[in-house]
Amino acid sequence: QRQMCIRDSMYSIMWLFMRKILFKIYLLFFFVGIAQPILSQSPYYYYKQLGIKEGLSQSKVQCVLNDHRGYLWIGTESGLNCYDRDHLKQYLHRPGDERTLPSNNITFIAEDSLCNLWVATMNGICLYDRGSDSFRTLSNNGKPIYVASYLLVEGGILLGGSGAIYKYVYATNKLEPLYYAQDPVYYNPFWQMIRYDEENILLNSRWHGIYSFNMKTYEVKKIESFTENNYTSIYLDSYKRLWVSVYGNGLYCYQGDQLIKHFTASNSPLTYDVIHDIMERDNQLWVATDGGGINIISLDDFSFTNIQQKQDDVHSFPANTIYRLYLDPANNMWAGSIRRGLIGIKNVYACSYQNVPFGNLYGLSNQTINSFFQDSDGIVWVGTDGGGINRFDPVSGTFKHYPATKYEKVVSIVEY
């Protein structure tokens, strides 16, 4: 049985001063040394939150775009927001003013290859005029066009509407209808459009199945093998595997026509069975859930890690209900939450721990550290100046405080 040998001594003021300097240097190199194996299992993240307190028009974020000028556009259920890294500016619908948004409920934001900024709302789609800081709503036969999805293609941008697909052609600056459903049964919004191969595009109508659209023939066909009635998200990864989430039934993975994986909260580490969005980053699949934070799946071995809000940990992820994921050009992930605004997620290579109430798992019992020691099992033992001994588990990232040493000054720890 291992015991810890603790030696409490008095030092001169000069030695204390020198020791603190030496300890800070040692602390830096120590954590650089142990950080690499920890990072390979569970990276450190820095979170930046933009919510109502920062000026966001509403807390449910439905879409995000980082444009070519570096501005971050944020669409909510109640207005469009533009963030210039210093300030948030709101854009709202004003009745009777055709130069404003047609609706405050923003469904997507897109920037095409000509740097046109598109904003889709529940009452139509519009183009943003940067010169006049205003919007122009597009129409078809004199009526606003409702679209729910987009896809950038050669020579223009595809727009998926209710039983309809349009193409905005750069050469003519006109909107051309490519497909109209003949049967009213198929007047369903296409909520997602993803390219499957050179000719075919997959369309997710959510409650009415998944369809394929042929870019050469303009034919739309329902894929009969998808028989569920609530597809919340579809995603084609870099290995050409199709990931499909079904409301309340987890995540499916298909290789061609074959189902190769089905992850649920009961048969895997998936933290929640309701999934809102899927995004790939650095050979990992990020999965946004409705109550379990973000699950991150390795595309090599299908292993899981997750980012979640933890009770009593003020530095943990700020929300567990995530509606939208967006990967910006700098490879930073943004998470649009349902109640906590927009959360920026950035990889960092170090983290800091501060003093917390005694017994809290996510910090030190005293912020002044006198000594520490890593034992043969990889556990880090920390001696504090008046808070006793702290035990840190690098794998879980949690601390344990020892009441028997609560007010002690611990200046040396060894193993025997």
PLM regions: where:
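Carboxylate-rich, polar loop motifs that coordinate divalent cations or form catalytic acidic clusters
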Residues: 7-416
